[in-house]
């Protein structure tokens, strides 16, 4: 079964109405062999905050070393976001395999008049995949209520009810007491039910669940078992929180703003302790600080401040208002869209005073008509109200009217927030087609449905080709406009709204110029897509020189004017001052040997020297911070005056800070900013930072990682890391991306990454390729350990495919390879250099 067929089948199940209860999903799970029976589950229910709490539990358990599944809803761009293992989305191949196995049973049940719903089936998908992935524990966000929710097909080892308010009253009941009763049913058999409820809801939960562990505010609820305090914002991304029990006090930071998130953090810590009683404080600190949760008071930019929040009921809107009070701004400009079944009057009434409003509608049938939403504001609030259409266009208008000291808030629905967020996350990936097979593979990966259409369009895909994901209504416009100027556009076979669809655009540069000019028409809400196409294909725009909507400049202009990667491929020389690094471990452990090697690299033409004090080879032990600083800082200080940039290869922010103090220019983090302090260090010091895609560091050779398409999957995951870094205050011009060859990829996948290096230009950042002497070369018959010839060949390929930096051990040979690759494209640059020397 092809992926688009599987996804279309799942979304077609949305036509079936919700029937509360677990009998249907239990039967499906039985048909699948009861995959849930071998997995430990944590269940998180609540009217608000259950998704944030589930994410915090997931992050802490992963930091403790557990293999963790996470199931949440709804999704933003891709249904696979709902099901994750260790932070990675379920592969397309696994989703397709599940649907192929479950479809006959689901069709039979529908024929009998007992169809399963979309949510029931996707919940079964999650439980099936968690078993297949062999997770240690899985965290489930309850969909609605508790007792009759599909997630209650499992017997949890730990559970929570975050809070209770009026919601889904037609199903759950008309009172807080009734709703609390159904939520209390998630209580585990052998552990207290953790809850942040108060008043009547808490009384009902105590009566229903019996054994309860309460979490409350330290001031108001001094009798709570776990007491939390909210210390307010410490920067524009993080808040200080204290979690206190009779046994310990934890002062932590969380990347989720708002006093209510402090209570969620207390609940999450309690759940993590129940699952892993021996979890240490460091895992709790790092887990909470890495618990990023998109669309929950997510600050996307400054000047003006832009905030995305998926608040979709009155209580959540009131919470947004309290968090906004922590920010200083002049006027508030609102982008508002919501579902038709929500209490719009109460939601609008809970929001703070606004200067202007643009209403909008997400690309989903449940979305409320923007005219109706406008009338609500006109009656209740009285600001300047504009009736909009598409979310992207509404966001553009709000940002255009906001001054630098104002705030733009997108609120009302996670579906609306999801569409707005693509302004920052959408990637336009350039494709190089050397053969018809290359073109066919691009169309296959984009899930173009019809085989004949794939074959026909492959023959046309011989000019410039890019691949991106947009809303279906935007895909229709792209196709019509590109066809009208003589280009071609293939669209994936996804048939249902609310899910982004793949588009593959092919044409000459002239055709793309005409397309992007047409897309500037405001009704299309595609100006952002046009800007990204121009940037990817290096097309001059009428407003050339301005940054795109994400604030990213052209990749070729990324960084300071003097950075060597702005003038062709730069060579980074590896200087390991360790006793055990692979290939050169121990050779430069002595400081005098290290300095001598650095000088030799400079003489050979190196552009950057990368100093590392900890090995990431398989089985390497972690080096304490003090020892790593002792190794790298003196070497960096000794070579800082050389005519070369110096980077430090470390995954620890404390080591990075010491290295910068010693004279380093660049931070090279092989864990992709896993240390939450690293991104703030880079922002504060203004240092470029290399962000690598890695699964494990040190490398775990036994770890098997599933990719559908390793290049596009890595681009997808790096997109969020780049956005995370930008939100911390690092300008995109200071971000360098590393696909992470050798880190959680097979040998064949490493070669795929090398051969398609140019596609990483979609991220708008310089690209680093690190392939030196790696075991990947055994795929082509090279002996492990010393692969100089293969490394040099790889360097030439990387330079030819657009790498901005290559990281290597052997500088002279690789400088020569880079020069040959550059000369093959632009020999005149070398003639000019020779004339200057003469």
Curated annotation (Swiss-Prot):
Pathway assignment: Cofactor biosynthesis; tetrahydrofolylpolyglutamate biosynthesis; Cofactor biosynthesis; tetrahydrofolate biosynthesis; 7,8-dihydrofolate from 2-amino-4-hydroxy-6-hydroxymethyl-7,8-dihydropteridine diphosphate and 4-aminobenzoate: step 1/2
Binding annotation for Mg(2+): 576
Record-annotated Pterin-binding domain positions: 569-819
Matches recorded under InterPro entries: DHP_synth-like (IPR045031), DHP_synth_dom (IPR006390), Dihydropteroate_synth-like_sf (IPR011005), Folylpolyglutamate_synth (IPR001645), Mur-like_cat_sf (IPR036565), Mur_ligase_C (IPR004101), Mur_ligase_C_dom_sf (IPR036615), Mur_ligase_cen (IPR013221)
Key word Transferase present: yes
Protein task: Can complement an H.volcanii mutant strain that is thymidine auxotroph because it lacks the two dihydrofolate reductase genes encoded by hdrA and hdrB.
Protein's name according to its UniProt entry: Probable bifunctional folylpolyglutamate synthase/dihydropteroate synthase
Native organism: Haloferax volcanii (strain ATCC 29605 / DSM 3757 / JCM 8879 / NBRC 14742 / NCIMB 2012 / VKM B-1768 / DS2) (Halobacterium volcanii)
Gene symbol of the encoding locus: folCP
């Amino acid at each position: 079964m092809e992926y688009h067929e599987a996804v279309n089948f799942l979304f077609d199940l949305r036509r079936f109405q919700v029937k509360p209860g677990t009998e249907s999903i239990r039967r499906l799970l039985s048909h699948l062999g009861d995959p849930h029976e071998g997995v430990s589950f944590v269940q998180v229910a609540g009217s608000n905050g259950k998704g944030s709490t589930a994410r915090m539990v997931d992050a802490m358990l992963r930091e403790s070393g557990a293999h963790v599944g996470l199931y949440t809803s709804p999704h933003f761009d891709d249904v696979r976001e709902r099901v994750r293992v260790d932070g990675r989305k379920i592969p397309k191949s696994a989703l397709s395999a599940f649907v192929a196995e479950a479809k006959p049973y689901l069709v039979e049940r529908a024929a009998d008049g007992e169809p399963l719903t979309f949510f029931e089936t996707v919940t079964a998908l999650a439980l099936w995949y968690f078993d297949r992935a062999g997770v240690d524990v899985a965290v489930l966000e309850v969909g609605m209520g508790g007792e009759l929710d599909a997630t209650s097909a499992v017997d949890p080892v730990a559970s929570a009810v975050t809070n209770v308010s009026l919601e889904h009253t037609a199903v759950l009941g008309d009172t807080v007491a009734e709703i609390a009763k159904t939520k209390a049913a998630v209580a585990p058999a052998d552990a207290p039910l953790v809850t942040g409820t108060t008043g009547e809801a808490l009384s009902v939960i105590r009566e229903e669940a019996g054994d309860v562990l309460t979490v409350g505010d330290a001031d108001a609820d001094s009798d709570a078992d776990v007491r939390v305090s909210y210390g307010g914002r410490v920067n524009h991304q993080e808040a200080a929180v204290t979690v206190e029990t009779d046994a310990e006090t934890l002062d932590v930071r969380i990347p989720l703003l708002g006093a209510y998130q402090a209570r969620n953090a207390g609940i999450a810590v309690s759940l993590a302790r129940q699952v892993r009683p021996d979890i240490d404080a460091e895992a709790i600190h790092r887990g909470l600080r890495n618990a990023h949760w998109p669309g929950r008071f997510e600050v996307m930019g400054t000047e003006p401040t832009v905030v995305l929040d998926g608040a979709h009921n009155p209580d959540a809107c009131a919470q947004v208002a309290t968090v906004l009070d922590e920010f200083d701004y002049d006027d508030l400009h609102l982008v508002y869209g919501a579902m038709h079944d929500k209490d719009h009057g109460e939601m609008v009434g809970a929001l703070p005073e606004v200067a202007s409003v643009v209403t909008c509608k997400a690309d989903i049938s449940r979305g409320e008509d923007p005219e109706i939403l406008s009338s609500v504001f006109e009656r209740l609030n009285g600001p300047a109200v504009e009736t909009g259409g598409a979310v992207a266009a509404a966001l553009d208008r709000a940002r255009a009217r906001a001054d630098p000291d104002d705030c733009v808030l997108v609120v009302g629905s996670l579906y609306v927030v999801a569409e707005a967020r693509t302004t920052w996350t959408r990637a336009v990936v350039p494709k190089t087609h050397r053969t018809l097979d290359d073109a066919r593979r691009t169309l296959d990966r984009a899930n173009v449905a019809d085989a004949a259409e794939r074959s026909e369009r492959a023959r046309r895909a011989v000019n410039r080709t890019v691949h991106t994901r947009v809303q279906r209504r935007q895909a229709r416009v792209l196709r019509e406009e590109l066809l009208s100027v003589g280009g071609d556009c293939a669209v994936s076979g996804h048939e249902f709204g609310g899910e982004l669809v793949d588009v593959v655009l092919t044409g000459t540069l002239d055709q793309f110029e005409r397309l992007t000019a047409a897309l500037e028409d405001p009704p299309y809400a595609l100006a952002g897509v046009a800007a990204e196409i121009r940037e990817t294909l290096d097309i001059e725009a009428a407003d050339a020189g301005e940054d795109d909507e994400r604030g990213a400049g052209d990749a070729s202009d990324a960084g300071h004017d003097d950075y060597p990667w702005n003038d062709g491929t730069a060579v980074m020389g590896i200087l390991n001052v360790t006793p055990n690094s692979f290939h050169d471990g121990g050779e430069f452990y002595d400081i005098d040997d290290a300095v001598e090697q650095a000088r030799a690299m400079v003489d050979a033409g190196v552009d950057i020297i990368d100093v590392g004090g900890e090995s990431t080879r398989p089985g390497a032990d972690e080096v304490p911070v003090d020892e790593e600083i002792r190794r790298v800082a003196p070497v960096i200080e000794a070579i800082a005056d050389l005519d070369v940039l110096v980077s430090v290869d470390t995954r620890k922010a404390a080591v990075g800070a010491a290295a910068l103090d010693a004279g380093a220019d660049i931070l090279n983090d092989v864990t992709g900013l896993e240390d939450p302090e690293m991104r703030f260090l880079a922002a504060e010091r203004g240092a470029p930072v290399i962000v690598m895609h890695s699964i494990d560091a040190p490398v775990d050779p036994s770890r098997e990682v599933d990719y559908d398409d390793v290049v596009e999957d890595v681009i997808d995951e790096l997109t969020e890391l780049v956005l995370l870094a930008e939100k911390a205050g690092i300008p995109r011009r200071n971000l360098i991306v590393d696909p992470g060859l050798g880190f959680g990829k097979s040998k064949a996948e490493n070669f795929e990454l090398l051969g398609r290096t140019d596609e990483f230009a979609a991220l708008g950042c310089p690209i680093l390729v690190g392939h030196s002497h790696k075991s990947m070369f055994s795929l082509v018959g090279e002996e492990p350990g010393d692969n100089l010839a293969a490394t040099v060949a790889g360097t030439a390929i990387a330079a030819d495919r657009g790498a901005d930096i290559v990281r290597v051990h052997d500088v002279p040979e690789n400088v020569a390879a880079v020069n040959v690759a550059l000369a093959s494209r632009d020999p005149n640059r070398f003639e000019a250099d020779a004339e200057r020397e003469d």
